Amino acid sequence: MQTLNDIRSTFLSYFEKQGHSVVASSPLVPRNDPTLMFANSGMVQFKNLFTGVETRAYKRATTAQKCVRAGGKHNDLDNVGYTARHHTFFEMLGNFSFGDYFKEDAIPFAWDLVTRELGIDKSRLYVTIYHTDEEAAAIWKKVGVPEDRIIPIATNDNFWMMGPTGPCGPCTEIFYDHGDHIWGGPPGSPEEDGDRFVEIWNLVFMQYEQFEDGTRRDLAAQSIDTGMGIERVAALLQGTNDNYATDLMRSLIEASADASNTDPDGPCKTHHRVIADHLRSTSFLMADGVMPSNDGRGYVLRRIMRRAMRHAHLLGAKDPLMHQLVPALVQQMGAAYPELGQAQSMIIQTLLQEETRFKQTLERGLKLLDDELSALGEGDDLPGAAAFKLYDTYGFPLDLTQDALREKGRGVDTDGFDAAMAAQKAKARAAWSGTGEAADAAIWFDVADAQGTTDFLGYDTEVAEGQIVALVQGGTATQTAKAGETVQIALNQTPFYAESGGQVGDTGVIKTANGVANVTDCRKTADVFVHMAKVTEGALSVGEAAQLTVDPARRTAIRANHSATHLLHEALREALGDHVAQRGSLNAEDRLRFDFSHTQALSHEELARVEADVNAYIRQNAPVETRIMTPDAARELGAQALFGEKYGDEVRVVSMGRKEGSGKGLSGDTYSLELCGGTHVRQTGDIGAFVTLGDSASSAGVRRIEALTGAAALQHLRAQDQRLAAVAADLKAQLADVPERVRSLLEERRALSNEVAQLRRELAMSGGGGSAAPDVKDVAGTPFMAQVLSGVTGKDLPGLVDQMKEQMGSGVVLLIADADGKAAVAAGVTKDLTAKLSAVDIVKASVAALGGKGGGGRPDMAQGGAKDAANADAAIAAAETVLKG
């Protein structure tokens, strides 16, 4: 049997032999493409190559691309688990040509691989072509496909377009016939939606460029983009038409069944399929840097998680289930995707945390759903307001509610739901709409085309000469910028670092023979370094030579913070575990901030250890070295790459610190080794000192450490010393004695507080704390004592209630404390009466009479509160009503 891993290997090896570069899958989060939620096809990472914006060293490429379809236009979530072929996560195998070969090679490659390498029966294969693509039809005949199995299609299903304008072209598709025991007809027939004929490979011929007026012209460089769904091919090679019966999916389904002690098939079949599919998408999304949250990509991830968790609940799983299945996934897919194994610990922790949290509300939410349904007529849809309440109160995404109702044959009033959510949706749309930067950025692509990209000189110098190649004001190119005007400046080369990788952009001065500009920031678009500046003297013009000077003191501080971030990252991994991975950073001149994957707050001891380790490697004063190499070579040396980051053919590797036996670096003794394009100190000692300001939560599963280095760290320590000295002076103690003196004062305060509380209770018991000492009255045969007290707090009441119960022997006590107008209520029932009376009921009635809500406790002791104690008599009367039954 050819496993899914075998098929992937066969595909990539075949095209490598045909001169293709094997390119690693891009992350699921598309880089620099806010228009796309997740990568959903193999061509996503090559988009700029097809449009000509970018060039690479290769003209032919092959990939196995991770894809997710859940959310937005491409959304398969609702169907997953209920059909044989829908997935939220899938792999797309593809081969690509960027102006190299075209149809005459692409079609024979596809036929040869499918029939000879994979061994698929030719008699079961059909192909479709675009109805006017006679060239493709002729090539298919030439490779041996009978004419009656070449099906012309006139619809857009066989014509691909990148957008309203731009590259486009016809498609040809290969279909597999599963046999007449399955309903369905060939493509183009009325029965084409059946499952008998399944598309396994789509070849797109990027042949034309379409213009706004609808006309098309031949592209100068014609390209190939193909996509083969590996799950579908695995199914047919393993003798099934069900993707979930393939080796990989079956292993995950059986892991789910084992963990839940249920049958993998039968009534539980759908639940296991949902869990198996969603395990893949959630794990790979987290491995690529997406963490569960309440907006954007993180919200889509949380929706997928919660859908799987509901199905785990339906299996009867009492404990969190999803995290138990991660090792089975890593075993199956970790070799092909190493990032999955690297993130395994973090994925397990995050899934456990999310499922534990969600289980607390899931049962209550499902009960609310059942209550709402029981109030409806037979077959009625759930009102939108109720669906929104499930979303707003219990965190049920709409699709999870729809999924639950689907099993009951019900639907949801989605219009009502949308109306209830209008405000949130408007806010979300505003957040996603951006600020117009995309339109402003277009001009820099034109600059890159006309003038080339910017050469960065700043690794080696902070002063350089360059030539102004473009000036932009208000999104429009200009030839001159005058004193007092703000302007964006592009040069052929620059020492100014452009903001990226968490490091802020440089500031400084640009000076020409005719003018001076202060640079306030530097950013990068289309590999053009854009200097944000204000002209302070004279004027600047395109074509002028310029003297470029980076603010040296600011750059020095930024270097120190960025290098300290690398040491901090490694120290955290050693202190907390390999699951720690960078989730974000800020390397500014005055501070650094580092976000990392970890699910709980650091203890004081852990934070102290991390700080000490960083300072130890600073004192080591080891050289900071950089090398240029391929990403694969860097990873072989043990370099840390950022989750979700896509690297080019060459990367810059920064190493610092020495640690015997680390196994990293060329000599196997490097402490920190990371892929990084930022600027760094020359020796770790240049950082000076490192002081943490604390640890906080950044988002779910992500912690944040803020810290200072160098002079800022020393200033912080001096300020701390001054504060401590001031405390010592107030305490009239030596600095070394301050902790003991503070502990002694706290003990004295605690003893005095206890003494005051005891005196208040004694005063209250004697009748001096409010109304006179109460008499015991008979209410419906039950001894009842009630009193309103002042000078006591709610914390005092339980002790007073117990004392009064003991004095009474048998009966009920109600105490109301009036503290600055607010009411604290406590009630007690002696043990002999708790079978028929509950202190909880008495407190709730009294609190309600005072205008409050709630109250709780045990049958023999309960407490509550309200904002106003003025209606104490009504509260006592309400308690008597409870006693009377």
From Swiss-Prot:
Judging by the UniProt lineage, the source's domain of life is Bacteria
Molecular-function annotations in GO: alanine-tRNA ligase activity; aminoacyl-tRNA deacylase activity; ATP binding; tRNA binding; zinc ion binding
Q: Is Nucleotide-binding included in the keywords of this UniProt record?
A: yes
Cellular location(s)? Cytoplasm
Q: Name one GO cellular component term.
A: cytosol
InterPro entries per UniProt: aa-tRNA-synth_II/BPL/LPL, Ala-tRNA-lgiase_IIc, Ala-tRNA-ligase_IIc_anticod-bd, Ala-tRNA-synth_IIc_core, Ala-tRNA-synth_IIc_N, Ala-tRNA_ligase, Ala_tRNA_ligase_euk/bac, DHHA1_dom
Keywords of the record? Aminoacyl-tRNA synthetase, ATP-binding, Cytoplasm, Ligase, Metal-binding, Nucleotide-binding, Protein biosynthesis, RNA-binding, tRNA-binding, Zinc
Q: How is the cofactor bound?
A: Binds 1 zinc ion per subunit.
Q: Does the entry feature the keyword NAD, yes or no?
A: no
**What residues form the membrane-spanning segments?**
none
* EC assignment: 6.1.1.7
Name the needed cofactors.
Zn(2+)
**UniProt catalytic activity:** tRNA(Ala) + L-alanine + ATP = L-alanyl-tRNA(Ala) + AMP + diphosphate
UniProt cross-references to PANTHER family, sorted A to Z: ALANINE--TRNA LIGASE, CYTOPLASMIC, ALANYL-TRNA SYNTHETASE
- Record-linked HAMAP family: Ala_tRNA_synth_B
Q: What job does the chain carry out? A: Catalyzes the attachment of alanine to tRNA(Ala) in a two-step reaction: alanine is first activated by ATP to form Ala-AMP and then transferred to the acceptor end of tRNA(Ala). Also edits incorrectly charged Ser-tRNA(Ala) and Gly-tRNA(Ala) via its editing domain.
Tell me the protein family, please: Belongs to the class-II aminoacyl-tRNA synthetase family.
Q: What is known of its domains?
A: Consists of three domains; the N-terminal catalytic domain, the editing domain and the C-terminal C-Ala domain. The editing domain removes incorrectly charged amino acids, while the C-Ala domain, along with tRNA(Ala), serves as a bridge to cooperatively bring together the editing and aminoacylation centers thus stimulating deacylation of misacylated tRNAs.
Under which name does UniProt file this protein? Answer: Alanine--tRNA ligase
User: Gene for this protein?
Assistant: alaS
